[in-house]
Every structure is written in C-alpha cells, then in structure tokens.
C-alpha cells in the first residue's frame, strides 16, 4: 500500500521548511514553492521552472497540491458570488465573494456546519460534522482565486480581504485556523495585510486567549444581545462564557494587537422586537463602555423556518442614533447576496449532522404537535 501523499496546502511556511529540510533542501526552496502555489496558482510541479528537475521529482513522489473543488456557484444581482465547495463524503461548505469598489472580500468557512447553536443562524440549524483542514480553509481562497483569475493573469489581486465569517466557529478549530491564517498573511502565501484578515467569534474565551498569543488579525465579536439573559437564548455559548468574561477576553486580545488599532468590531444582528428597542440600545452602550469598539448593526437575513423577523429600518435607525449619542461609531451593514441566500446568517451548505440536532428538533416539533392535537 502506497504512502499517503502530503498535501502542501496543509503546510504553513514553518512546516513547509521542515519538509524541505527532511528532503535535504535549503529553506529558500520552500519559499519558492509557496510563491508558485499562492502567487501564481500553480499545482503542477513541472511548471515550477526555477526548481530543479530532481527536486521536482522528489516533490511529485511525496507531495501533492490539492484544493477542494467548486461544486457550483450562484451570482447575485449585486455582484456577490456564493460558491458551494465540496469537502468529501457528499458534503459542501459555502464561501462568499463580495466585490466592492475599493476591495474584494472572501467570506471563508472553518467548519462543516457549526457546533454552536445560535438561534438566528441558518448554519447552526444544519448541525455539525467536523472541522475543516488547513488545505480546505486556504483551498477556498485558492479555488476562488482560480475562478476569478490570479494576479499574474489579470494584473489585479483577486481577493484583498478575507473574513472568517462563513460556516462554523473559527475558535473551535484553532489548530487548523491558525496555520491557515498564517498562510493568508505570509509574504510567500496570499500576502494579505493583518488588518485585512478578520476572524469573527461568538466567544470561546480560552481559545481567544490562545489566538492572541499566536497571531495578530482583526477581530469581530458576535455580541447580538445587551445582557446575559437574552444572549443565553440567542447565543447559547454565553452560558459557558458570559458577556463580562467574553469582554475581558476581548480587551486582552486588543491590548496585544496592532491589527485592531485599539478597538474591536462588535457585530449585532437586528431582530425585530427581540433585541432592537431603544432601551436595549442604551443597555448595549453601557455594556461596551469599557471596551473600545465600533458597532456593526446587521439587518437580520431570514431563512426558511427562521423564528425571527428583520428589524424595520426605523427601529434600526433609532437604535443606531442611541449608540451614537454615547460616542460610538456605528455602521449599518449593507445586505449583500440575500437573493441567493449568501447574506450574513444564511449560509447552510450540505452537511451530515453528527450532532443529530435536526433529528432532535423534528422529534420535539412532532411531540408538540401531538400534544396540541
């Protein structure tokens, strides 16, 4: 039985150099290889013309460069493109490309499904199967870059920003997310600025501390409620890591960080008559008074079976004005790609749920139906 080949997309520069040392090669050869992969999109060793033939043969014998395939894609009327990425066993994750005048952002997934159970998120309703590997995370960027055209072909960088805001909780897959983000930031990788790579978390505090020790990227935090009582319902991980504990972890992270310029982005989904009153706006402003931040208000994007509705523009406007009275910077996120279910909270993919969450939910619904009848 032949030995399984090493997928080079799984290796950050440190691991790549270790592999080359094992091959008896100097570190700069690893850097050359990374440039071929991430700057030029090359996956065939024979095309790497500044690497000698003997080394190319060694690499071909032991290694491969394999990214997950794009199964399908949909393009929104606003230019947003949602990609279904096949990750094996009939499963797909979703990745979203969001073009703007001054940037091109890719929203990347970190898990097949999500282990958290936020009640307003479509991904959470699908259950959870597994963590994505490093190659499956960076492979999303690599594949979409191929789809759009690498800079060598177009003269322009196809993706300028990456946000870890797709399917999954990135901090629950830290072992793979950290090397994946290392590759995003590496000059020999995708060469993105640390201010242009953003990780979004619902608040797994111990992992946030580990991230702060390992990497400096922009941080976005999913708050969504001004108090623990409501957040326990909307974001159940709050029962384990309540708001004050989460906020303390956020302050520790931004104290170490240059990428965040001294403040964090607070994400707050606007749910009609759930978390959008002026009283709750005052409460949120008070909650955040010791944590430097800007607030991103996200109009809720409904999905089939969702128990919530989107806040009206007038309620969002009133909420925003209250926050600004406290001196907070407030941005109301423009909804992108909702016509193809690519907007915030709408990503679902195709998942084999190992948590049996959907089955349990249907059983509970059936029991309620029987009781009512």
UniProtKB/Swiss-Prot annotation:
Origin superkingdom: Bacteria
Gene3D superfamilies in the record: 1.10.150.530, Aldolase class I (3.20.20.70)
Known catalytic reactions: adenosine(2503) in 23S rRNA + 2 reduced [2Fe-2S]-[ferredoxin] + 2 S-adenosyl-L-methionine = 2-methyladenosine(2503) in 23S rRNA + 5'-deoxyadenosine + L-methionine + 2 oxidized [2Fe-2S]-[ferredoxin] + S-adenosyl-L-homocysteine; adenosine(37) in tRNA + 2 reduced [2Fe-2S]-[ferredoxin] + 2 S-adenosyl-L-methionine = 2-methyladenosine(37) in tRNA + 5'-deoxyadenosine + L-methionine + 2 oxidized [2Fe-2S]-[ferredoxin] + S-adenosyl-L-homocysteine
Residues that hold [4Fe-4S] cluster according to the record: 114, 118, 121
Record: residues binding S-adenosyl-L-methionine: 168-169, 200, 222-224, 301
Keyword Glycoprotein: no
Keywords carried by this UniProt record: 4Fe-4S, Cytoplasm, Disulfide bond, Iron, Iron-sulfur, Metal-binding, Methyltransferase, rRNA processing, S-adenosyl-L-methionine, Transferase, tRNA processing
Active site residues according to the UniProt entry: 94, 344
Ranges of residues in domain Radical SAM core: 100-339
EC number(s) stated in the UniProt entry for this protein: 2.1.1.192
Pfam family, one: RlmN_N
GO cellular component terms given for this protein: cytoplasm
GO BP: any one term: rRNA base methylation
GO MF: 4 iron, 4 sulfur cluster binding; metal ion binding; rRNA (adenine(2503)-C2-)-methyltransferase activity; rRNA binding; tRNA (adenine(37)-C2)-methyltransferase activity; tRNA binding
Disulfide bonds: 107-344
Chief location: cytoplasm
Function: Specifically methylates position 2 of adenine 2503 in 23S rRNA and position 2 of adenine 37 in tRNAs. m2A2503 modification seems to play a crucial role in the proofreading step occurring at the peptidyl transferase center and thus would serve to optimize ribosomal fidelity.
The family this protein is said to belong to: Belongs to the radical SAM superfamily. RlmN family.
Anything else known: Reaction proceeds by a ping-pong mechanism involving intermediate methylation of a conserved cysteine residue.
The protein, known as: Dual-specificity RNA methyltransferase RlmN
Species assigned in the record: Shewanella sp. (strain MR-7)
């Amino acid at each position: 039985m032949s030995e399984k080949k090493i997928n080079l997309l799984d290796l950050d520069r440190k691991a790549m150099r270790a592999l080359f040392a094992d091959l008896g090669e100097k570190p700069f050869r690893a850097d050359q290889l990374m440039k071929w992969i991430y700057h030029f999109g090359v996956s065939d060793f024979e095309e790497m013309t500044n690497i000698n033939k003997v080394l190319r043969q060694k690499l071909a014998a032991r290694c491969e460069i394999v990214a997950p395939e794009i199964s399908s894609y949909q393009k929104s009327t606003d230019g947003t493109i949602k990609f279904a990425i096949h990750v094996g066993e009939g499963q797909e994750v979703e990745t979203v490309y969001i073009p703007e005048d001054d940037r091109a952002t890719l929203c990347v997934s970190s898990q097949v499904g999500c282990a958290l159970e936020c009640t307003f998120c479509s991904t959470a309703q699908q259950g959870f199967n597994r963590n994505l590997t490093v190659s499956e995370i960076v492979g999303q960027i690599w594949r979409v870059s191929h789809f759009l055209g690498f800079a060598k072909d177009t003269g322009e960088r196809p993706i300028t920003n990456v946000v870890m805001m797709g399917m999954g909780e990135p901090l629950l897959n830290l072992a793979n997310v950290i090397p994946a983000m290392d590759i995003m930031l590496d000059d020999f990788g995708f060469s993105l600025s640390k201010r242009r790579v953003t990780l979004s978390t619902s608040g797994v505090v111990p992992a946030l501390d580990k991230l702060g020790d390992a990497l400096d990227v922009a941080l976005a935090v999913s708050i969504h409620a001004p108090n623990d009582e409501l957040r326990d319902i909307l974001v159940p991980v709050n029962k384990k890591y309540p708001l004050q504990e989460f906020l303390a972890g956020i302050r520790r992270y931004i104290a170490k960080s240059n990428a965040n310029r001294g403040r964090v982005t607070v994400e707050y989904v606007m749910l009609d008559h759930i978390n959008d009153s002026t009283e709750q706006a005052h409460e949120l402003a008070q909650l955040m008074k010791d944590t430097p931040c800007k607030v991103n208000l996200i109009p809720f994007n409904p999905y089939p079976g969702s128990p919530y509705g989107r806040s009206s523009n007038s309620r969002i406007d009133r909420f925003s004005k209250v926050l600004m009275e406290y001196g907070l910077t407030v941005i109301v996120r423009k909804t992108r790609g909702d016509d193809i279910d690519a907007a915030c909270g709408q990503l679902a993919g195709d998942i084999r749920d190992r948590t049996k969450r959907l089955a349990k939910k249907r059983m509970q619904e059936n029991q309620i139906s029987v009781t009512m009848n």
